[in-house]
Amino acid sequence: MLGREDIRTYQVYLANEKKLAPGSIHIALSALRFFFNVTLERDWAPEEVLPLPKKPQKLPIILSPDEVQHFLGCVADVKHHAILTTCYAAGLRISEAVQLKPTDIDSQRMVVRVEHGKGQKDRYVMLSPKLLEILRDYWRMWRPEAWLFPGDRAGHPITRYAVGQACVKPHDLSRLSKPVTPHSLRHAFVVHLLEAGADVRTIQPLLGHRSLATTAHYLRIATNKVCATESPFELLPRPAPTPPPSKPQYF
C-alpha cells in the first residue's frame, strides 16, 4: 500500500514537474481514492495521509450594465442576439438556454419554464417584458417549432459551443477589455440584481442553486454592497490642523 511519502512525492511531482493546478491535483488524488476504495475495496483516502491543496477562489470579472447593453448591441445575428439576451435577462445557464422550447415562454404569467436544470430540477424564472419583445421579433422571423433556438442539425437545438462562438465577433466589435461568455452574462444577472437591492433568498431559486451559500458568494462581487459600508477609518477623530510654517526671519 502506498505510504505518506509516496503520496507526497507524487503530489510534488504533479505540482513541480507536471505544473498542474490545484484542481487537477485534486482530480489525480481522487482517482487514487477511487482505485483504493472501489477497485481494491480498501478504506483509504489520500487526504488522510496528506492534506489536499486548496483551490484558489477567484472572483469572476463582472460586466457593468452599460457593458452588457453595449455587447448585446454588437450582436447582429437575430437568433444569437435572442439567446444571449435570454442568458442575461433570465440568468440562465447556457445548458438551460439551448434546451428551451417555444412552449416554455409563458407570456400570460410572464415567466420562463426551465426544465431539467442543474440537478434535474424544473423551475420558473422571470420573463422580462423587454425580453418578451425581443423573443417575439425573433419568433416572427424564424418561426421555431420544436426548439426555441434550433441548431444547424434538423431536429436538434443550437449547441453550447455555437453560442459560445457567437460571442467572439461581437466581443471584438465591442472592444470591451473584459471577457464575455454566456456564463459571464449569467454572473452579471446575479450581481446586477444584488446591486439593485434584491435579496439573496429571492435570487437563489431563480438561479436554481441548492445552497444559499452558493448564491451568497456573489455578495463578495456586488460593489455597491462593499462601497455602502463605511470604513472604520472614517470614524476616527480628525487630527488637529497643522499650524502653518513660521515665516523666515529675513524674507
From Swiss-Prot:
GO MF annotations, alphabetized: DNA binding
Residue ranges occupied by any Tyr recombinase domain in the UniProt entry: 58-231
Superkingdom, taxonomy of origin: Bacteria
Active-site residues per Swiss-Prot or TrEMBL entry: R93, K118, H183, R186, H209, Y218 (o-(3'-phospho-dna)-tyrosine intermediate)
Record flagged with keyword DNA-binding: yes
UniProt cross-references to InterPro entries, sorted A to Z: CB (IPR044068), DNA_brk_join_enz (IPR011010), Integrase-like_cat_sf (IPR013762), Integrase_catalytic (IPR002104), Integrase_recombinase_N (IPR010998), Integrase_SAM-like_N (IPR004107), Tyrosine_recombinase_XerCD (IPR050090)
Keywords, ordered alphabetically: DNA integration, DNA recombination, DNA-binding, Plasmid, Transposable element, Viral genome integration, Virus entry into host cell
Gene Ontology biological process terms in this record: DNA integration; DNA recombination; establishment of integrated proviral latency; symbiont entry into host cell; viral genome integration into host DNA
Gene3D superfamilies found in the cross-reference section: 1.10.150.130, Intergrase catalytic core
Keyword DNA-binding (UniProt): yes
The Core-binding (CB) domain, residue ranges: 1-40
Family the entry assigns: Belongs to the 'phage' integrase family.
Name of the protein in its database record: Putative integrase/recombinase y4eF
Origin species: Sinorhizobium fredii (strain NBRC 101917 / NGR234)
